[in-house]
C-alpha cells in the first residue's frame, strides 16, 4: 500500500498493481522499498468487519484470468481491533502481533508458480503459535512448505528481500515443538517467514521484500493481516488475492452451500463468509486463492525454508488458531506479505499458485474438515445473491509497522470468479498473482487484511470492493483452472493428494470442514470485528490439532486425514459428489478459512451476506454455517458457540478423530486447542456471534444467534438446507448431527459421514424435531424444513435442547441422522419408554416400575421428556429421566405431536411396563403400590396448590399502603391474645380479603414485631407488611367491651382519639382463636366426644406441621397458647376461588350482627362442616437459633456464648412442652401445671400428671401423647415430628387389631404394615376418584392431610409410632 499513494478507479489488468494499477513488477523491483501505494486510508477508514473481508484478500483471491476485474477503490480504514484482541503478541514491538493461525482446512501447498509467494497474514483468532507449530501433529497438516501465516510485520525485523522458504511442517513441527515458547518459535517463524515471504511472496514473482511479511506478521489485526497477507512479502500492505476464482455461479453456490453444509467448502466459506458473503465463487476464489497463495508459498521451499523452524512454532500457533503451515499458511503466507506490504502483490503463481490453490482447495477441503474455517472462505455464501457485489476490505494492522499506511478500499469487479471444476478450481482469469509491492511504507505497515464479501457467490461476474486501509491492495483474479493451479505448483502433487484424499474421504473432509468451520466463524464472533483471529485461530488450531489440516495445507499427507474426495465430502454433507462446485470450495475453504478465521472472527458479519455469514457462522454458529455447511460442517457449528478451536480439534478431528473439543459441552462455544502449546498464542474464543454478526446476517442472524445460544430448536429455515443437528448440544455431537440432518433431512449418510465418526466420542443425539442439533445443515443448498424450528414441540424442544444438550453424550447416532420429518416416528418410539419411565422420572426416585413417574404426566404427554424417552430409556431412563425426556422432546416433530404421542406412546409404554410381569401377583401388586404412591405424591402437591392458592406469592405492604385498605366491617372479626383483627379489602386487589392486625401491645414494644423469616406455610401467619399507623381508639377498645357487653358507648367515648399502633397486614382472615373454639365447644364435646376429639387431633396435627416448619428454620415460638392459635375458614371447592368467596361473607359476618352466626358455627366445632385451618401467630417471643446471622459483630458475640446457650438447649423442646399443655386445654382440661403447682418445683413422672377422661377412642392416644410431650427430661421428650406421626396414627390407623398377633416378629409386622399402607393408598385413590365425579363434594382439608400421611408413610415409622402409643 505504501508503494501507491493515490487510488483511482481503473480497469485493473492482470499483472498490474491493484492499488495503483501500475505493473506489479515495478513494485517488486524494490523489495525492501515497496512503492508507496495510493494513499492508504486512515486506520479509521478500516472497517472492523472488514478485517474478515481483508482476510479474504489475504487468503489470496485471484481474479479469474479471463475477466478483467474493475477495482472500485473506496477509501476506508479498516480496523481489526477485534483481531488484535485475538492476536496474542508476545513478540517485541517490531513484531506487533503475529497470530500463527492454521486454518483447519488450509493446505500449505502453494502453487508452484506461487511457490515463492508467501502470504503471511496473521489470522484472526489465531494466536501466536504456542510452542510448537499447530501442525506439530504427526499428520503433516502443515506441509513442509508451511508458511507462517499471520506473521505480518514480523518481517519488520527481517529484510523483505528474505525469501520465505517452504518448510516441511512436520519437520518444523518437531523443531518448533522444541522451542521453549510459542513466542520464540513465533519470532523465529517471523524471521524465517519474512525471509521466505520476500522470496516467495509472489509465486511467479519473487517476493522482493520480506518486510511486508513482517508487516503482515505484526499487523495489529490478525484478521486484517490475514487479509493483507495476501500481499507480497515485501513492504506493500498489498492484499494479494490469490487465485480468486469465483466458481461458476452454480458451482460456487453449490460449493458454498455444499461447503457450508459439507464442511469442505464451508471452511473456505467460513473464512470468506466470515468476512463477507461474496459469491460462493468469489469466496472460493478469494479464499481459495489465498490458500493457494499460502500453499504456493509453502510450495516454494525457498520461501518456507527460512521459516522452517518458525513454521513449527507456526504450527503450534496455528494449532492455536493460526494457520501457519496449512494451505492457509501457504495461502496465508501470501497474505502475510500483503499484510506486511499492504502490497498489491496478489502473488499468484498462475500455475503453481492456482494449482496449489486447487490443491489447496482440495487439500483444504480435506483439511477443512479439520479446519473448517479455512475451507469456509472458498465456499462463499452458498446462496449469495448474484446481483450483490463482493465487498473486499483490506484492513491493515499497524502495530509494529512504523509507517501506518491506510490502504484505500478498492472495488474490484471480477467478471467471473474461480469455478470449481470437478476437483479443482478453474480460474477464469489466467493471470497470475499480481505481485505489486508497495513502497517502503509497506514494510513498516502491518499487513492489511482484505475481506471480500460476495453477496452472490453464484455470480460469476462480481464487483469486488476492496476497502483497504493500505491503499496498496493488490487483487488479481487470475483465472486458471484449479487443476492448473494444482498441477502447476511444485507442490501440486501434495495438493492433489490432499484433494484426492479428500475426495476419497469426502466424509472426512466434510467432517474436517465442519470442525474447522465451527472453530472460528468470524461473523459468528460478532463481538470481535477483528476477533476473527480467534475464530480463525480456533479452526486452524482445530485442524492442526487434528493434524488433518497440516496434511491438507501442505500436501496430501494431511489431506489423507481429510476425506480424499471433495465431492464425496460434499455428498456426505448432503451435497452430491457430483456437485464439484461445492466440493472444490471445500478445498478452497480450507485455505481461505485459514486466512479467513482472521477476519471472520471480527468483521465478516458486517457486509457478509447471511449466507456467507452462515459459512462463517458454520464455524461459530453451526446453524448459519449449517446452511453453507450442509456437508456437516454445521455439525460443529451446531453448537451455537462453535468451539472455534473445537472445530480445529474437533473439526479436523471429525475426520480422523473424535472432536475432543466438540466433546466438551456444547455450551462452551470455544474449545481450546488440544495442544496447549498451540494455545500458547491462542486467544480466548471470540464471543459467540451475537448482535453484530447475527444482525448482519440478513437471513439467519436470528438463526445464528439461536445456534450460538445452543437453542434446542432448529434454526429457522433461513439457513437453507442447513439442518444442523445439534445432537447432544455438544460440539462433538453437533458435527455428527449436522451431517446427519444435512438438508434437515433424512440424509443419514451425511450424518454418518466421517465427521460423525470423528465425533463419535459423543454420539450425536439428533433433535429430529428441529433442535439446535438439527440446525446444522447437512444438505448443500436445501433450506432446513421451515417447520424445523417448530418441529420440536416447544415443551419438548426446550427440554429437548436442554436434555439432549446436557443430557447425554449418549447420542443416538442414528437419531441425528433422522430427519425432523421422521421425528414424530422417533417420538412415538421414544414416547412409550417415556411413559414407562415417566413415573420413575418424576421427582421421586421410585424405580420399582417404569411407571413410577406421574401417571398424569405420562399419559397426558404434557411432559415433553416423556415422549422423548425411548423404550431403551424407559427402564434405564430411571437413571437419567431428564435425558430421556430431552431425547423424546427432540425427536418429537411438533409439540402437538409430542404431546399426543406422549399420551399414547407413553401410556402404551407404561402399560407395557406394568404388564411385563402381569403373571406374577407379587410383581403386579408391587407395581400397583408404586403407582398409588406416585399418585398420592402428586395429589399432595395438587392439594397444596388448591388450598394455598395464590398464598405462595409473598406480598409486601408499607405505611404508604395504609390508605389503600378499607375495612369490610367496623367490628373485629377476631380478638387474639396479642391483637385485634379486622377484615379489609385493598384497592389494588379488590377481589382478595386481607386481615388488618392491630397489635394491642404498646407501639414501642410492638414496633420490633417481625414475623419469622421463613417460607410461606399453610399453618404460619404470613406477614405482608407491618408499620406504625394511627388507629382510632374505638378499634382497640371495642373488642374488650364487645367480648363482655355490647358497650355501644365505647366508640362514642373517644371517637376522635387516635392511637399509634403497629399494624400488620396478613392474608389469613381468622374468624376465631383456638381459645374461642374450646370455649364454644364444651357442649359438643360432651355430646359428640369422638367427633370433637377427632377435630382436636386435626388441629394438633396442623400445629405440629407448622412447628415442624419453623424448627426446620431454627425458630422456636415459645408462646404457644390457645389465644395465639387462629382458626380460619377453609372449605375449598373444586378451585381456590370458592374458598376465597366464603371468606368474604364470613368476614362480613364478623360484623357484630353476624358474629353470633359465626360463633355458632364454631361453637358446634364438631358440627362444623369443614375442618378449620389453624394458623400460628404472635412471634413476639420467638427465638431463632444463633449462627444464621451474617453480621460480623453478632457472630463475634455469639462466639462467646456458652454451648447450652448457643445450642438453645433450654428451648430445644420448648414448643413440644407447650404442645403437651395445649392437649389438656383443647380437651377442656386445665393446665396441669396450674392445678398442681408442685409439678413445677420438682421432677415429676408421668403418673404425676393428671389423667385425661377417656371419652372416645382418641382419648387414650391423646393422653399418651400429652405425657410424651410433657416429659420432665427434655432428652426423653419426643420431638414435634414424632408427635405429628403419632397424631396421624391416631387419625388414620393402623389400629390395635392389626398388630395384635401372638408374638409377631418385627419383620412380619413390617410386611403387614407395608401391605396396610398399600391398601390405604388404594382406598384413598378411590375416595378421590369418587369425589371427582360428585359435584357437591370437593377435596377437603382432611383429605389433604391424609394424603400427606399416606404418601410419606413407611413401615418403620409406623412401627415406631405404634410403640410410642403403646399399641405394641
Curated annotation (Swiss-Prot):
Residues 940-1291 form the Protein kinase domain. Changing residue 1021 to E: No ATP-binding activity. Keywords: Cell junction, Cytoplasm, Nucleus, Phosphoprotein. Residues 414-434, 564-574, 652-666, 707-717, 725-741, 1134-1144 have a biased composition (Polar residues). Changing residue 939 to E: Does not affect homodimerization. It comes from the Eukaryota. One of its GO terms (biological process) is cell migration. It holds the Pfam family Pkinase. Residues 906-949, 1293-1368 are annotated as: Required for homodimerization. Phosphorylated by CSK on Tyr-238, Tyr-343, and Tyr-391; Tyr-391 is a primary site of phosphorylation. Residues 200-236, 297-330, 392-443, 499-605, 636-792, 799-818, 873-901, 1134-1166 are annotated as: Disordered. It is found in: Cytoplasm; Nucleus; Cell junction, Focal adhesion. The modification Phosphotyrosine is found at residues 238, 343, 391. Changing residue 997 to A: Does not affect PRAG1-CSK complex formation. Does not affect PRAG1-induced protein tyrosine phosphorylation. Residues 502-518 have a biased composition (Basic and acidic residues). The modification Phosphoserine is found at residues 667, 716, 753, 797. The dimerization region encompasses helices both from the N- and C-terminal of the protein kinase domain. Catalytically inactive protein kinase that acts as a scaffold protein. Functions as an effector of the small GTPase RND2, which stimulates RhoA activity and inhibits NGF-induced neurite outgrowth. Promotes Src family kinase (SFK) signallig by regulating the subcellular localization of CSK, a negative regulator of these kinases, leading to the regulation of cell morphology and motility by a CSK-dependent mechanism. Acts as a critical coactivator of Notch signaling. Homodimer. Dimerization leads to the catalytic activation of CSK. Interacts (via C-terminus) with RND2. Interacts with CSK (via SH2 domain) in a Tyr-391 phosphorylation-dependent manner; this interaction potentiates kinase activity of CSK. Interacts with NOTCH1 intracellular domain (N1ICD). Forms a complex with N1ICD and MAML1, in a MAML1-dependent manner. This is Inactive tyrosine-protein kinase PRAG1. It comes from Rattus norvegicus.
Amino acid at each position: 500500500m505504501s508503494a501507491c499513494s493515490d487510488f483511482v478507479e481503473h480497469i485493473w489488468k492482470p499483472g498490474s498493481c491493484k492499488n495503483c494499477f501500475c505493473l506489479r513488477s515495478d513494485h517488486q523491483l524494490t523489495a525492501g522499498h515497496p512503492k508507496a501505494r495510493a494513499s492508504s486510508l486512515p486506520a479509521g477508514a478500516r472497517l472492523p468487519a472488514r478485517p474478515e473481508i481483508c482476510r479474504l484478500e489475504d487468503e489470496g483471491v485471484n481474479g479469474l484470468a479471463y475477466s478483467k476485474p474493475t477495482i472500485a477503490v473506496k477509501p476506508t480504514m479498516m480496523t481489526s481491533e477485534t483481531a488484535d484482541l485475538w492476536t496474542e503478541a508476545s513478540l517485541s514491538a517490531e513484531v506487533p502481533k503475529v497470530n500463527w493461525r492454521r486454518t483447519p482446512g488450509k493446505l500449505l501447498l502453494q502453487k508452484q508458480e506461487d511457490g515463492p509467494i508467501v502470504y503471511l497474514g496473521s489470522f484472526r483468532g489465531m494466536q501466536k503459535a504456542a510452542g510448537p507449530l499447530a501442525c506439530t501433529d504427526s499428520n503433516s497438516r502443515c506441509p513442509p512448505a508451511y508458511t507462517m501465516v499471520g506473521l505480518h510485520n514480523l518481517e519488520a525485523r527481517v529484510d523483505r528481500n528474505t525469501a520465505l522458504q517452504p518448510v516441511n511442517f512436520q519437520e518444523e513441527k518437531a523443531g518448533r515443538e522444541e522451542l521453549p515458547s510459542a513466542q520464540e518459535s513465533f519470532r523465529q517463524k517471523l524471521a524465517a517467514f519474512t525471509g521466505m515471504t520476500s522470496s516467495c511472496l509472489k509465486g511467479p514473482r519473487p517476493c522482493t521484500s520480506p518486510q511486508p511479511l513482517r508487516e503482515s506478521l505484526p499487523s495489529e489485526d490478525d484478521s486484517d493481516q490475514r487479509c493483507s497477507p495476501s500481499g507480497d512479502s515485501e513492504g506493500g500492505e498489498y492484499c494479494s488475492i490469490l487465485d480468486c476464482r469465483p466458481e461458476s455461479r452454480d458451482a460456487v453456490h453449490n460449493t458454498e452451500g455444499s461447503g457450508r453444509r459439507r464442511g469442505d467448502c464451508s471452511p473456505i466459506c467460513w473464512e470468506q463468509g466470515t468476512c463477507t458473503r461474496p459469491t460462493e465463487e468469489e469466496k472460493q476464489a478469494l479464499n481459495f486463492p489465498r490458500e493457494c497463495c499460502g500453499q504456493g508459498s509453502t510450495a516454494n521451499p525457498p520461501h518456507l525454508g527460512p521459516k522452517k523452524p518458525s513454521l513449527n512454532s507456526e504450527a503450534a500457533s496455528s494449532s492455536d488458531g493460526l494457520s501457519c503451515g496449512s494451505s492457509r499458511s501457504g495461502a496465508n503466507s501470501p497474505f502475510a506479505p500483503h499484510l506486511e506490504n499492504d502490497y498489491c502483490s496478489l502473488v499468484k503463481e498462475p500455475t503453481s499458485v492456482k494449482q496449489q490453490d486447487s490443491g489447496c482447495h482440495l487439500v483444504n477441503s480435506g483439511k477443512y474438515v479439520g479446519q473448517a474455517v479455512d475451507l469456509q472462505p472458498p465456499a462463499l455464501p452458498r446462496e449469495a445473491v448474484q446481483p450483490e457485489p463482493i465487498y473486499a476490505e483490506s484492513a491493515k494492522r499497524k502495530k509494529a509497522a512504523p509507517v501506518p499506511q491506510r490502504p484505500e478500499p478498492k472495488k474490484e469487479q471480477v467478471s467471473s470468479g474461480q469455478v470449481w471444476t470437478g476437483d479443482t478450481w478453474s480460474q477464469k482469469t489466467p493471470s497470475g498473482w499480481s505481485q505489486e509491492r508497495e513502497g517502503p511504507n509497506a514494510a513498516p505497515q502491518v499487513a492489511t487484511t482484505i475481506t471480500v464479501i460476495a453477496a452472490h457467490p453464484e455470480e460469476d461476474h462480481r464487483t469486488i470492493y476492496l476497502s483497504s486501509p493500505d491503499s496498496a491492495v493488490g487483487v488479481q483474479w487470475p483465472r486458471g483452472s484449479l487443476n492448473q493451479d494444482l498441477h502447476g505448483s511444485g507442490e501440486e502433487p501434495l495438493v492433489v493428494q490432499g484433494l484426492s484424499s479428500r475426495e476419497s474421504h469426502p466424509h472426512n473432509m466434510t467432517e474436517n470442514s465442519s470442525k474447522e468451520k465451527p472453530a472460528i466463524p468470524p461473523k459468528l464472533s460478532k463481538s470481535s470485528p477483528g476477533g476473527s483471529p480467534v475464530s480463525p485461530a480456533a479452526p486452524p488450531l482445530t485442524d492442526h490439532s487434528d493434524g488433518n489440516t497440516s496434511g491438507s495445507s501442505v500436501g496430501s499427507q494431511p489431506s489423507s486425514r481429510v476425506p480424499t474426495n471433495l465431492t464425496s465430502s460434499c455428498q456426505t454433507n448432503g451435497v452430491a459428489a457430483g456437485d464439484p462446485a461445492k466440493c472444490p470450495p471445500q478445498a478452497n475453504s480450507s485455505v481461505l478459512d485459514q486466512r479467513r478465521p482472521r477476519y471472520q472472527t471480527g468483521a465478516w458479519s458486517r457486509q457478509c451476506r447471511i449466507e456467507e455469514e452462515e459459512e462463517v457462522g458454520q464455524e461459530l454458529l453451526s446453524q448459519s454455517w449449517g446452511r453453507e455447511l450442509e456437508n456437516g460442517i454445521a455439525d460443529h457449528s451446531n453448537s451455537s458457540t462453535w468451539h472455534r478451536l473445537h472445530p480445529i480439534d474437533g473439526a479436523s478431528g471429525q475426520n480422523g478423530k473424535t472432536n475432543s473439543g466438540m466433546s466438551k459441552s456444547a455450551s462452551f462455544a470455544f474449545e481450546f486447542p488440544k495442544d496447549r502449546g498451540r494455545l500458547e498464542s491462542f486467544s480466548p474464543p471470540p464471543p459467540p456471534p451475537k448482535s453484530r454478526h447475527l444482525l448482519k446476517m440478513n437471513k439467519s442472524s436470528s438463526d445464528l444467534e439461536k445456534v450460538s445460544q445452543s437453542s434446542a430448536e432448529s434454526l429457522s429455515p433461513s439457513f437453507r438446507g442447513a439442518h444442523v443437528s445439534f445432537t447432544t448440544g455438544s460440539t462433538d455431537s453437533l458435527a455428527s448431527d449436522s451431517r446427519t440432518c444435512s438438508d434437515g433431512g433424512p440424509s443419514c449418510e451425511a450424518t454418518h459421514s466421517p465427521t460423525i465418526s470423528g465425533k463419535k466420542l459423543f454420539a450425536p443425539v439428533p433433535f429430529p424435531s428441529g433442535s439446535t442439533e438439527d440446525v446444522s445443515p447437512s444438505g448443500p443448498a436445501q433450506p432446513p424444513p421451515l417447520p424445523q424450528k417448530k418441529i420440536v414441540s416447544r415443551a419438548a424442544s426446550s427440554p429437548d435442547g436442554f436434555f439432549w444438550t446436557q443430557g447425554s453424550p449418549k447420542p443416538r447416532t442414528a437419531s441425528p441422522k433422522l430427519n425432523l420429518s421422521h421425528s414424530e416416528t422417533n417420538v412415538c418410539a421414544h414416547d412409550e419408554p417415556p411413559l414407562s419411565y415417566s413415573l420413575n422420572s418424576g421427582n421421586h426416585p421410585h424405580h420399582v416400575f417404569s411407571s413410577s413417574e406421574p401417571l398424569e404426566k405420562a399419559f397426558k404427554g404434557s411432559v415433553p421428556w416423556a415422549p422423548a424417552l425411548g423404550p431403551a430409556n424407559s427402564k434405564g431412563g430411571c437413571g437419567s429421566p431428564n435425558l430421556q425426556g430431552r431425547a423424546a422432546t427432540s425427536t418429537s416433530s411438533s409439540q402437538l405431536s409430542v404431546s399426543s404421542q406422549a399420551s399414547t406412546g407413553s401410556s402404551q409404554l407404561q402399560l407395557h411396563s406394568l404388564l411385563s410381569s402381569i403373571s406374577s401377583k407379587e410383581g403386579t401388586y408391587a407395581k400397583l403400590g408404586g403407582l398409588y404412591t406416585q399418585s398420592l405424591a402428586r395429589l399432595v402437591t395438587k392439594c397444596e396448590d388448591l388450598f394455598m392458592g395464590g398464598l405462595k406469592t409473598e406480598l409486601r405492604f408499607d405505611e404508604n399502603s395504609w390508605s389503600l385498605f378499607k375495612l369490610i366491617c367496623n367490628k373485629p372479626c377476631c380478638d387474639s391474645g396479642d391483637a385485634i383483627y379486622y377484615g379489609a379489602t385493598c384497592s389494588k386487589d379488590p377481589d382478595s380479603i386481607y386481615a388488618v392486625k392491630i397489635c394491642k401491645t404498646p407501639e414501642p414494644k410492638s414496633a420490633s414485631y417481625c414475623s419469622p423469616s421463613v417460607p410461606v406455610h399453610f399453618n404460619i401467619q404470613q406477614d405482608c407488611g407491618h408499620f406504625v399507623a394511627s388507629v382510632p381508639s374505638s378499634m382497640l377498645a371495642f373488642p374488650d367491651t364487645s367480648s363482655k357487653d355490647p358497650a355501644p358507648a365505647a366508640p362514642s367515648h373517644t371517637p376522635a382519639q387516635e392511637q399509634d399502633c403497629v399494624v400488620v397486614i396478613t392474608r389469613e382472615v381468622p374468624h376465631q382463636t383456638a381459645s374461642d373454639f374450646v370455649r364454644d365447644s364444651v357442649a359438643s364435646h360432651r355430646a359428640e366426644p369422638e367427633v370433637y376429639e377427632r377435630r382436636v387431633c386435626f388441629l394438633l396435627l396442623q400445629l405440629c406441621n407448622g412447628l415442624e416448619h419453623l424448627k426446620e428454620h431454627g425458630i422456636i415460638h415459645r408462646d404457644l397458647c390457645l389465644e395465639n392459635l387462629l382458626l380460619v375458614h377453609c372449605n375449598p371447592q373444586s378451585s381456590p376461588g370458592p374458598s376465597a368467596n366464603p371468606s368474604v361473607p364470613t368476614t362480613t359476618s364478623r360484623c357484630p350482627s353476624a358474629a353470633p352466626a359465626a360463633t355458632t358455627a364454631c361453637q358446634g366445632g364438631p358440627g362444623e362442616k369443614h375442618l378449620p385451618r389453624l394458623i400460628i401467630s404472635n412471634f413476639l417471643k420467638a427465638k431463632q437459633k444463633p449462627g444464621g446471622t451474617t453480621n460480623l459483630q453478632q457472630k463475634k458475640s455469639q462466639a462467646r456464648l456458652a454451648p447450652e446457650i448457643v445450642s438453645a438447649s433450654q428451648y430445644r423442646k420448648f414448643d413440644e412442652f407447650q404442645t403437651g399443655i395445649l392437649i389438656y386445654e383443647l380437651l377442656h382440661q386445665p393446665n396441669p401445671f396450674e392445678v398442681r403447682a408442685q409439678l413445677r418445683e420438682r421432677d415429676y413422672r408421668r403418673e404425676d400428671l393428671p389423667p385425661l377422661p377417656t371419652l372416645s377412642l382418641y382419648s387414650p392416644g391423646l393422653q399418651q401423647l400429652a405425657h410424651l410431650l410433657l416429659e420432665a427430661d427434655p432428652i426423653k421428650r419426643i420431638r414435634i415430628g414424632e408427635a405429628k406421626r403419632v397424631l396421624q396414627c391416631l387419625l388414620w390407623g393402623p389400629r390395635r387389631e392389626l398388630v395384635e398377633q401372638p408374638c409377631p416378629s418385627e419383620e412380619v409386622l413390617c410386611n403387614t404394615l407395608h401391605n396396610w399402607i398399600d391398601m390405604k393408598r388404594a382406598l384413598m385413590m378411590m375416595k378421590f376418584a369418587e369425589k371427582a365425579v360428585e359435584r357437591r363434594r370437593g377435596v377437603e382439608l382432611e383429605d389433604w392431610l391424609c394424603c400427606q400421611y399416606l404418601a410419606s408413610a413407611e413401615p418403620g415409622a409406623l412401627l415406631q409410632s405404634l410403640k410410642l402409643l403403646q399399641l405394641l
